[in-house]
Structures are given as C-alpha cells and as structure tokens.
Amino acid sequence: MSILINKNTRLIVQGITGRDGSFHASKMKEYGTNVVGGTSPGKAGQEVCGIPVFNTVKDAVAATQANTSIIFVPAPFAKDAMLEAIDGGIQLVICITEGVPTLDAVAAQHYAKVRGVKVIGPNCPGLISPEESMAGIMPTNIFKKGHTGVISRSGTLTYEVVHNLTQAGLGQATAVGVGGDPVVGLYFEELLQMFQDEPETDSNALIGEIGGDAEERAAQFIKEHVTKPVAVFISGQQAPPGKQMGHAGAIISSGSGSASEKIAAFEAVGVPVARETSEIPTLLKQQMKK
C-alpha cells in the first residue's frame, strides 16, 4: 500500500558524519529503516551508529546496492550532493537541506528528470511508509500503517494532520513532505497519480499553502484523474499579500497564490476543503461512505 519507500528500501545518508546526518541516521535506523551506508569525503572506513561510511555515493552503491539517498549537507553543497547521487546510481533522492539556491535546485531537478531519477525536496521533512521505512526527520510515533496517502507542502502541519488521522483510525500508506521551496522535485500531481495507481490506498489528504499555483493545478488534476476521496487543508488563510510566511515558496504575489483562490479551485471541482486540520478525517470518512 506504500509508495516510493518500503521495507525493501536500501538507504544511504549523504553527510552522515555531520551533526544532523548522524543524529537522523540513528533515528531512521532505530525506526527500522534499512540504512545500509553513508558518505563523507575522506572518511571511508569509519562507522556511524554501526553504519559504514564511504567516500562517495558510487562506492556506497557498489558495496551496499543502495537505491535511495537522503541528503544532510550545507546548502552551498546540496546541488553537488544531488548530482553525485543521481550519477551514483540512486533512484530516489531526498534532499532535506534548507536554503538551497534556486538556480542550484533548477539544475539538479533538470538533471534528475533527464536521468529518470525521482527527487523529494529540497527543504523538506522527507517521507515515511509507517512500520516499513522512514527517510526523513519526521516524528515517527504519530504515524500508523494504513490506507490514506498524505501529501504536504508543510512539515509541521503534516504532523498535525497525521496525528488527527491516526486518532480517527485512519492509518497512512505513505506520507510525503514535498518541500516548501519554489523549485522542488515530485509534487502534488505525480504523487496523487502514484496513490491513485496503488490499489490498497483508499483516500488522500493534501496539505497546501499560499504561494504559487501548485494547488490550483492539483485541483484540476484531481478532477481529471483521481477517483479516490481527497480532503484538503490550505494554510496561510490570514496571510497578507507580499509577505513570506515560513517557506520561500509561501508568498502571495502579483494578486495570485492566495488561500482563498486555492480553496475556490478545489471547491469548484468538488473537493472538500477543511477550515481546520482536525476536520480532515471527517471529510475523508464522509466521502468513503458514499
């Protein structure tokens, strides 16, 4: 019922000897993720939490058959880390790093597309398939295995919605934090299609926010391609135009990207929009009864 990662995922951690990399490598391994290695130039032969360290992604893949990488490196080096992962044979790259220059993100995303590699992020919390695998920085205790897909532009609101879903008895198939920057990898349409194609996923929770037109495009995509129940929450409903709210991509500009416009787009195609995150489970259950 999961997408992108599962119990067979073989994960490496780029930047594993750094503070964030080592901390989250330990947490992911503790959760049960198959963390098979990490990279840090010049530190091959070391171990972090019992995880072997390699100089390069190519070396790590050759030794461990890793297929997924998560990146914890400073923003100026994130593009090179993504390119190295793509060239090294990784099929799914998750970039946690915040503050990646936009042109660096554009270059990395373009190269990934050319090479057929999937990317999550940058500036994202990663993803989790509960009780199977977690590649990210998410608080695992709130998640429960189930049949609802979760797609979110917001990190902390993901956790709030997931907590509400779990409390309502709606476990999650996979929860994906797509990232809050203007340029990121997999987005609403691609992930909605993956959940649509996954036979055991029966519903979707989508968390959007102000800025850009991703939610408007998602609404049209749902109308044309998605038959499973979807419930939506849009953050930033009180945000003033021109002021950045948290993420680099969360800004209303040129008279577009407001919460009201996004809410209207979903309601126009029959997708219910929650005014509070706590309403998401009820909206999904109402649709599943039809």
Language model features: what each stretch is:
Residues 1-290:
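Catalytic-core regions of core metabolic enzymes
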